[in-house]
């Protein structure tokens, strides 16, 4: 983000305890307007607790939180949930829809609560505009019980954005969806971010979702910040074991470790590559030098915010000096090398 912007979310030294149990420990980070910010980590790492603190549903034991101009230093009696909800919306994995209300009525509800000054026609116009944006107009008179999981989540998103918030907090909103519905939700969230400038904070255990949508990622472990950076930086360059475990969970290290490799002449490498390198013949360029032989064990290409990035697991075979020269060539080509053995 541009340096001239102030953070729309600022978290400084936030800790939270429940009895003797530490839920969050000195968490600090900033989110800037227009970012799609991911929060990842294993179960129990503090992701949802942190998100609830950002929504002021939970309060930290210590530290400061500022979100869209509201902060936790305000006395409880002076904090206006109504005013806060005009600027910040929260979407959970459980949809939270009123079963007795139609799709239209569910989406109109926050407008009637937070914008009572709006006329009936103004409410209808804003609701139908939101329905059209999410391709839900044809279901406006349906009840939640008659909707698919993906449609319910779209309604939850519509209800969250109908008041035109500055920030939307998303808690595991694709966890119960099938792959096609997940892709659809990702596209809509990206569209929200790019066309309406809404800042998104996304908690997810689905790392593929994070790769596809997030510009920046906070990695949490046991309630603390393990690592923070752009999605590309963490995928390509991280040396952190927790980050690599999350970002490269599709690499079966145990299976690779069980393979036999001849001493001195073979080594296993992970090659990380980004953008234009994903479609170039980087392996063939190395093989053509005649320095080494290369066997490909595994590989994958993912879209990171519509830019291809991926990895290859290879066995590099040759004499020590030849392997060294081959690795130097790979680095010159822009490949990031991680050694297994």
From Swiss-Prot:
Keywords associated with the record: Amino-acid transport, ATP-binding, Cell inner membrane, Cell membrane, Membrane, Nucleotide-binding, Translocase, Transport
One term of GO molecular function: ABC-type D-methionine transporter activity
Reactions catalysed: L-methionine(out) + ATP + H2O = L-methionine(in) + ADP + phosphate + H(+); D-methionine(out) + ATP + H2O = D-methionine(in) + ADP + phosphate + H(+)
Disulfide linkage: none
Keyword Translocase carried by entry: yes
A Pfam family recorded for this sequence: NIL
SUPFAM superfamilies, per the entry: ACT-like, P-loop containing nucleoside triphosphate hydrolases
PROSITE patterns for this protein: ABC_TRANSPORTER_1, ABC_TRANSPORTER_2, METN
EC supergroup of this enzyme: translocase
InterPro entries according to UniProt: AAA+_ATPase, ABC_transporter-like_ATP-bd, ABC_transporter-like_CS, ACT-like_dom_sf, MetN_ABC, MetN_ABC_transporter-like, NIL_domain, P-loop_NTPase
All copies of domain ABC transporter, residue ranges: 9-247
Gene3D superfamilies per record: 3.30.70.260, P-loop containing nucleotide triphosphate hydrolases
Membrane topology term: Peripheral membrane protein
Presence of the UniProt keyword Translocase in the record: yes
One Gene Ontology cellular component: plasma membrane
Subcellular location: Cell inner membrane
EC number assigned by the record: 7.4.2.11
Chief subcellular location: membrane
Protein residues bound to ATP: 41-48
Subunit structure: The complex is composed of two ATP-binding proteins (MetN), two transmembrane proteins (MetI) and a solute-binding protein (MetQ).
Its job: Part of the ABC transporter complex MetNIQ involved in methionine import. Responsible for energy coupling to the transport system.
Family assignment from sequence similarity: Belongs to the ABC transporter superfamily. Methionine importer (TC 3.A.1.24) family.
Protein name, UniProt field: Methionine import ATP-binding protein MetN
Name of encoding gene: metN
């Amino acid at each position: 983000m541009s340096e001239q912007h102030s953070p729309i979310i600022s978290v400084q030294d936030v800790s939270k305890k429940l009895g003797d149990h530490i839920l969050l420990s000195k968490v600090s980070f900033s989110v800037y307007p227009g970012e799609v910010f991911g929060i990842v980590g294993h179960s129990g790492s503090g992701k949802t607790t942190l998100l609830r603190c950002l929504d002021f549903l939970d309060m930290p034991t210590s530290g400061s939180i500022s979100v869209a101009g509201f902060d936790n230093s305000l006395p409880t009696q002076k904090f206006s949930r109504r005013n806060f909800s005009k600027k910040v919306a929260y979407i959970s994995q459980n949809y939270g829809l009123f079963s007795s209300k139609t799709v239209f009525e569910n989406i109109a509800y926050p407008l009637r609560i937070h914008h009572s000054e709006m006329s009936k026609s103004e409410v209808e116009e804003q609701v139908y505009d939101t329905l059209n944006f999410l391709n839900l107009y044809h279901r406006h008179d349906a009840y939640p019980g008659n909707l698919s999981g993906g449609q319910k989540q779209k309604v939850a998103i519509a209800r969250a954005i109908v008041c035109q918030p500055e920030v939307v907090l998303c808690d595991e909103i694709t966890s119960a969806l099938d792959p096609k519905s997940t892709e659809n939700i990702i596209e809509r969230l990206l569209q929200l971010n790019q066309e309406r400038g809404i800042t998104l904070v996304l908690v997810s255990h689905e790392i593929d979702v994070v790769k596809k949508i997030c510009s920046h990622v906070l990695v949490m472990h046991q309630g603390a910040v393990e690592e923070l950076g752009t999605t590309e930086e963490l995928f390509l360059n991280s040396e952190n074991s927790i980050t690599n475990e999350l970002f490269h969970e599709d690499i079966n290290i145990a299976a690779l470790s069980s393979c036999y490799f001849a001493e001195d002449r073979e080594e296993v490498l992970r090659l990380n590559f980004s953008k234009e390198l994903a479609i170039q013949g980087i392996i063939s360029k190395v093989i053509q030098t005649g320095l080494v032989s290369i066997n490909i064990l595994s590989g994958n290409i993912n879209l990171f915010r519509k830019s291809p990035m991926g990895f290859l697991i290879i066995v590099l075979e040759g004499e020590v000096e030849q392997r060294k020269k081959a690795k130097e060539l790979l680095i010159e080509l822009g490949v990031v090398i991680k050694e297994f053995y």
